[in-house]
Amino acid sequence: MRLTQAPPSRRTLMTLGAGATMAALLPAGGAAYASTSTAKAPAAEGISGRLRALEKQYAARLGVFALDTGTGAGRSYRAGERFPMCSVFKALAAAAVLRDVDARREFLTKRIHYTEKFVKDAGYIPVTGKPENIAGGMTGAELCAAAVSESDNGAGNLLLRELDGPTGITRFCRSLGDTTTRLDRWEPALNSAEPDRVTDTTSPGAIGRTFGRLIVGSALRAGDRKRLTGWLVANTTNRPTFRAGLPDDWVLADKTGGGEQYGVANDVGVVQPPGRAPLVLSVLSTKFDPKGPTDNPLVAKAAALVAGELT
């Protein structure tokens, strides 16, 4: 399974000007994307009301950004507000490694060795914690796959180590025109999701555009874009979020993120209905109670609502 990239629609080209590309549909600005047609304003207001109802139902704060890359139509809700990022960063780490660390095409095949303590300190380690991997190490490609497809915290930290720490993610995002997304700490500390925390956060609009640039834009070389997309399509953690909310025949290239504090539940990526251009979709959520439960159905329902509006 793979994503196919359709050219921008004629209407979008006219709106953006001659020479517009898929990357042009994903502007760097932090403002929430607005629908390109005033005729769709009532629909946009309707979707906002339904998203507010979901917030009330789940006692949560919800942020959504969606963009149809074929038509330029979009929907957003709290798209400029900051939310904890959690494990969503792992896709950015893999992308940064592909672009910057593997520039000479050596890292993916290089065997990376690490100590048992290094990965155990990270928490969730379904792949890096295996005895055979601790003993023999893992290749760069295996670490990327473990971080993105399995959300392995140890693999995420090992990729951060290659990027000279969490601030490497921030620098990478700035190089893409994303002035909002930032990472400051390692796993598992980065998952503390206190209200008003700025560190280790992003916004639905910023992270959505960044994923769009990476997956259907030109931020990565074609081969690297294909590798990253493959790891995202192989995601094993999205069954209760995007996979639960979107039709079974849609291709999903997404990364989840969640935490035990403040009930964080996130999913971000590019999704493709059959026969249509891809949709950029980000859904971020958090609770007001530090012991609030993680409600993946909230993410699934929000994704279904906005995707339904655009298709």
Swiss-Prot record:
Assigned EC number: 3.5.2.6
Binding residues for substrate: 255-257
Modification after translation, per record: Predicted to be exported by the Tat system. The position of the signal peptide cleavage has not been experimentally proven.
Listed SUPFAM superfamilies: beta-lactamase/transpeptidase-like
Catalytic reaction equation(s): a beta-lactam + H2O = a substituted beta-amino acid
Active site: 87 (acyl-ester intermediate)
Coiled-coil segments on the chain, per record: none
NCBIfam families: bla_class_A (NF033103)
Name used for this protein in its record: Beta-lactamase
Organism: Kitasatospora aureofaciens (Streptomyces aureofaciens)
